C-alpha cells in the first residue's frame, strides 16, 4: 500500500505471537537481512520483488511471493533448486533471463496481470479472462508484446529446464 516496513515497526509486530514472518517488497536486499536478523529462526521472511529472487534468497529470504510466478512457475522452481544446489552461476543466468521476461511482461499498455493472462492462454491453453477495473486490459496494440513474452518464457524453459 505504499508504506515501507521499518525495522522498528517489525520489532513491534514481532511482539504479537500471530506474526510468523513478513513479505519484504522493498528493492534493497539489505532489508531482508535486517528482517531475518530481527525475527530469528522462528520467523520467516519472504522475498517480494521477483527481479531479485536470487539476491533475496541469498540474503536469507526462505521463499518468495511474486506476481510473475504464475506465468513461469517452473522457472522460479528451477531457480530455487539452483540456489539449493549452490549453482550460483547458472542461477544468476536464469535470474537475468527471468528479468528479461519481466521486462517484457511490464512493457505493454495493458496491466502486467492482463499480459500474464494472455501469456497463459498462449503457452498453457488457459483462458482465464482479462483483468477487472481499475486494471487496464491488454489492447490489440499489445499483441506483439504478449507474443514476445510468451516466446521468451518458452525459450527460457527450453534453455534451463
PLM region descriptions:
Residues 1-99, 109:
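Catalytic alpha/beta core domains of metabolic enzymes, predominantly
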Residues 61, 72-161:
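C-terminal alpha-helical cap/extension of soluble enzyme domains
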Amino acid at each position: 500500500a505504499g508504506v515501507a516496513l521499518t525495522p522498528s515497526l517489525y520489532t513491534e509486530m514481532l511482539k504479537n505471537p500471530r506474526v510468523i514472518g513478513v513479505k519484504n517488497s522493498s528493492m534493497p536486499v539489505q532489508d531482508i537481512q535486517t528482517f531475518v536478523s530481527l525475527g530469528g529462526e522462528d520467523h520467516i521472511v519472504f522475498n517480494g520483488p521477483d527481479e531479485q529472487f536470487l539476491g533475496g534468497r541469498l540474503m536469507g529470504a526462505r521463499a518468495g511471493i511474486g506476481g510473475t510466478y504464475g506465468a513461469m512457475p517452473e522457472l522460479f522452481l528451477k531457480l530455487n533448486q539452483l540456489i539449493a544446489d549452490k549453482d550460483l552461476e547458472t542461477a544468476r543466468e536464469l535470474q537475468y533471463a527471468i528479468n528479461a521476461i519481466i521486462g517484457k511482461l511490464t512493457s505493454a499498455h495493458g496491466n502486467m496481470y492482463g499480459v500474464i493472462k494472455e501469456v497463459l492462454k498462449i503457452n498453457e491453453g488457459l483462458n482465464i479472462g482479462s483483468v477487472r477495473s481499475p486494471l487496464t486490459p491488454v489492447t490489440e496494440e499489445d499483441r506483439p508484446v504478449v507474443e514476445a513474452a510468451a516466446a521468451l518464457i518458452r525459450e527460457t524453459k527450453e534453455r534451463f529446464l
